[in-house]
Design a protein with these regions (language model features):
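Catalytic cores and adjacent flexible loops of soluble metabolic enzymes
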Residues: 1-351
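Tight coil/turn sites that cap or link beta-strands
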Residues: 293, 330, 408-411, 446-448, ...
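A short, N-terminal "cap"/entry segment at the start of jelly-roll beta-barrel domains
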Residues: 343-400, 492-508
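Conserved short histidine dyad/triad with adjacent acidic residue
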Residues: 386-388, 403-419
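Glycine- and acidic-residue-biased ligand/ion/polar-headgroup-sensing regions
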Residues: 408-409, 419-437
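Short acidic-glycine-tyrosine-enriched beta hairpin
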Residues: 424, 438-456
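Double-stranded beta-helix
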Residues: 462-508
Length: 508
C-alpha cells in the first residue's frame, strides 16, 4: 500500500512570515521552490489557518497583552489570499500542508485540497480539535512539543484507532531552541516505542545550526520541518526562521548525513577496502622443511606479514590441512599446495548457521532462557541447510506445544503435512511466505495461520523471519512430505538436535 510518508520529506513552514502580504508570501514560495529543485528533495510548503472570529474570544480580539493575538490579527489573510498562495505552491511543484487551530479551519483545509494536515504541539491535547482532524482522513503529521510520553501514547492509540495515516514529529517548543534543549535521543525512543510510525524532527533551533538535522537523520527521522521566510528592508525574520540560503545549507547537512549513514542494509565492500585489509593480514609460513602428506600442525608454521598472492592466511589455517608437496623452511603456504579437509563440513555449516540465527533473534529482540532444545531440520543434508530447512527452538511440549522457528534468508521448508498435530503460526519478525493447499499467503508480524492435520503446506522467507508455532502435542515422525526421498530418510539423518545452543555437542 502506498504511504504518503514513504520518502524523506522536508516541510517549509511559512507560519505568519508572509506578514499579511500575498506578494511577500508568493516571493517566499518561489524562493523556497528554487531550493527544493536545486537540492532535489521532496518538499512540502506549510501554512497555518486560524479562524480568528471563533478562535479568539470577542472581548480579547483587540488585546495587546497576548503577543500572539496581536501577531495573528496583524498578519491576517483572506481565504482567497490563501488560495492564491496554495496555487503558487502547486505551480512550484511542491506538496502542501496546513495546520488548523480550530474546527472551522479543518473544514477549510479539506475543501481547499491540501495534501497533508498538521497537528501543532499546542493542539495535541485539544481533543475536540483532534477528533475533527481525524475525521478529515488526510495524511496527518503530529508535533509533540511539551507532551508527556503518556499523552503521546494516547495520540498514537487514537489516530491508529481512527485509521488515519500519520507521522509523529519530535519537537521542542522553545523559540529558538538551544543545543542543550534539543533532546534528539527522543527520536530513538519514538522509533522503538512506535516502530510502525514515521518519525520526524520539527526544529526551532537557530538557523545556523545544521548539525541537528544530520543527527536527526542518522537516528532515523524521515520528516524535517523548519520555519522559513525572507528578509527585506522592512521585514526581519525571527531567530528560528531560515532564509533560502540557510535552508539550503540545512538540506546539504541532511544530504551529507544520508551519504555517511548509507542505506541501512548489509554494506558491500569496495575492492580497495579489501585490498587495504589483505596487505595487513598475516600469511602462513613454514618453520622447517616439510614433506608431502604431512599436516600443518601449529609447531610447523608461523604467521607473518606480508600475505602473498594465493597464500593461505592465518585466519583460514587449521591443523588438519595436508601438504600436497614437499616445501622448504620459510616457504609461504600457497593454496594450490595444500588439501583442506571437508570432513565435518556439515557440522561447520550448522555452527555457522547458529551465529546467523542468534543475530536474527537479537535483531528481532527475542530473548530465550537457558532451558531449551534446538533442532536443525536439514531435509537434503546439512550441506544444503542454508537453502532447504528450518531452525527450531523447542520451548514446551505437553498437552500443548510451543516452538520458535527461524527461517534464514532464502531458506525454504519443503511441502508436508502432519498426521496428528494441529498448529498455528504467528510471525514475530520479518515476513513469512506460505503455501497451504496451493494457496499462497504472506504473513507479516502479528499475523497468524492455522494449519490443521492433513493440510499440505510449505513456507520460506526472502529476508529472514522468526515465527512462533503453537500446537497440540508434538510427536516425532508426524510429518509426511511430498518428496519420497525425505520420507525414506531416518529422522536422525534429517535432524540434528542439541541442548541449548549445542555448545560442545556440535563438533568442528
Amino acid at each position: 500500500m502506498f504511504s504518503p510518508f514513504s520518502n524523506d520529506l522536508f516541510v517549509f513552514d511559512i507560519a505568519n512570515n508572509h506578514q499579511g502580504s500575498v506578494d511577500h508570501g508568493i516571493n517566499i514560495i518561489k524562493e523556497f521552490g528554487k531550493v527544493a529543485k536545486e537540492k532535489n528533495v521532496k518538499c512540502i510548503f506549510k501554512f497555518q489557518f486560524r479562524d480568528l472570529a471563533t478562535l479568539i474570544h470577542p472581548e480579547f480580539i483587540n488585546s495587546t497583552e497576548n503577543k500572539h493575538i496581536k501577531r495573528f490579527t496583524s498578519t491576517k489573510l483572506k481565504v482567497e489570499d490563501y488560495q492564491i498562495l496554495l496555487d503558487e505552491v502547486k505551480n512550484q511543484g511542491l506538496l502542501s500542508m496546513c495546520t488548523p487551530f480550530d474546527e472551522k479551519s479543518v473544514d477549510r483545509i479539506s475543501e481547499m485540497g491540501f495534501d497533508f494536515i498538521k497537528v501543532a504541539s499546542c493542539c495535541a491535547t485539544d481533543w475536540p480539535l483532534l477528533k475533527k482532524i481525524s475525521e478529515a482522513f488526510m495524511p496527518t503529521v503530529i508535533s509533540t512539543g511539551g507532551l508527556k510520553i503518556k499523552e503521546i501514547d494516547n495520540l498514537v492509540s487514537f489516530f491508529n484507532h481512527k485509521g488515519n495515516d500519520f507521522a509523529l514529529m519530535h519537537c521542542v517548543s522553545v523559540y529558538p531552541s538551544e543545543d542543550n534543549e534539543l533532546s534528539l535521543n527522543q527520536i530513538d525512543l519514538f522509533k522503538n516505542r512506535y516502530s510502525k510510525i514515521p518519525i520526524g524532527w520539527s526544529t526551532h533551533e537557530h538557523p545556523y545550526n545544521t548539525t541537528a538535522v544530520a543527527i536527526a537523520k542518522s537516528k532515523g527521522a524521515s520528516l524535517f520541518e523548519r520555519h522559513v521566510g525572507l528578509n527585506t528592508e522592512e521585514i526581519s525574520l525571527n531567530l528560528y526562521s531560515s532564509t533560502p540560503e540557510q535552508a539550503g545549507e540545512w538540506i546539504d547537512s541532511y544530504i551529507s548525513a544520508s551519504k555517511m549513514c548509507g542505506d541501512g542494509l548489509n554494506r558491500t565492500h569496495p575492492e580497495n577496502e579489501q585490498h587495504s585489509l589483505e596487505i595487513l593480514k598475516r600469511g602462513v609460513y613454514l618453520k622447517d622443511d616439510i614433506e608431502m602428506g604431512e599436516y600443518l600442525t601449529k609447531d610447523k608454521v608461523f604467521f607473518a606479514m606480508p600475505l602473498q598472492e594465493n597464500q593461505l592466511d592465518s585466519g583460514t589455517w587449521n591443523e588438519k590441512i595436508e601438504v600436497r608437496k614437499s616445501l622448504k623452511i620459510n616457504d609461504p603456504i600457497l593454496k594450490n599446495s595444500i588439501k583442506i579437509p571437508d570432513n565435518n563440513k556439515g557440522h561447520k555449516i550448522l555452527k555457522e548457521a547458529i551465529h546467523e540465527i542468534k543475530a536474527l533473534l537479537n535483531e528481532a529482540s527475542i530473548v530465550l532462557n537457558s532451558e531449551f532444545d534446538i533442532e536443525f531440520s536439514h531435509h537434503y543434508g546439512k550441506e544444503k541447510f542454508f537453502k532447504v530447512g528450518t531452525f527450531i527452538v523447542n520451548c514446551i511440549n505437553r498437552d500443548y506445544c510451543k516452538k520458535i522457528l527461524v527461517q534464514l534468508p532464502g531458506q525454504k521448508h519443503p511441502v508436508h503435512y502432519h498426521l496428528k498435530k494441529e498448529e498455528t503460526f504467528q510471525v514475530l519478525y520479518g515476513c513469512l511466505e506460505t503455501i497451504t493447499e496451493g494457496q499462497r499467503r504472506t504473513l507479516h508480524p502479528g499475523q497468524t495461520l492455522l494449519i490443521q492435520p492433513g493440510v499440505w503446506h510449505s513456507f520460506w522467507s526472502d529476508q529472514g523471519c522468526v515465527f512462533e508455532e503453537v500446537s497440540t502435542t508434538h510427536f516425532n515422525n508426524d510429518s509426511i512430505y511430498n518428496d519420497k526421498k525425505i520420507n525414506d530418510m531416518k529422522r536422525e539423518d534429517r535432524k540434528t538436535t542439541a541442548t541449548n545452543w549445542g555448545r560442545f555437542t556440535i563438533n568442528d
